[in-house]
Amino acid sequence: MNENEQATRTSGTTERSLPEEVEVAIVGAGPTGLTLAGMLSGYGIRTAVLDGAQGPALHSRAAVVHARTLETLEPLGVVGKMLGGGVVVPHFGVRDRDRLLLRVDFDGLPTTHPYTLMLPQDRTERILLGALHEQGGRVLWEHEAVGIRQDAGGVDLLVRGARGDGRVRARY
């Protein structure tokens, strides 16, 4: 890992201690977990996002962001940054050498985003992580959820962390 990758990787490491209790515990700091945490934090709901990784992903596992996903992300205020860092694709084609087998045009979709956006997932996650930080939320990196106990009042999430085991109590 070079210096830039290390600096980028550790920039996501913002909090190491487990909170005792939160409203919502979220397992995984991928696009879905970060989106949920960002939206809940925007409503003042305290979350704990737990992820066993050392920090944000360094490499992409996906690259396409669909129109409905962009609509969903609008309340977080991240779509402009995503568009600025990606490539808008107004149509999609499948070819067999020189022969076009299928063409899908997105401009007829009933959406404010009649296209797909090509943006590597690691960049998407960094943008979502930035939005979460702006809302006051954090990710607990190097904290892996290893068990759950549920009762009428919520859940106890059993966590294995870099500094030992612990638990987080959450209503949801």
Model-predicted regions and their roles:
Residues W141-D156:
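A conserved short coil-to-beta-strand element within the FAD-binding core of flavoproteins
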Residues L58-Q135, R149:
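Active-site-adjacent segment of FAD-dependent monooxygenases/related oxidoreductases
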Residues M39-A62:
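Glycine-rich FAD pyrophosphate-binding loop
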Residues E20-V22, G164-Y172:
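Core beta-strand elements of the Rossmann-like FAD/NAD(P) dinucleotide-binding domain
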Residues A29-P31, G52, Q121:
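Glycine-rich Rossmann-fold phosphate-binding loop(s) that bind the pyrophosphate
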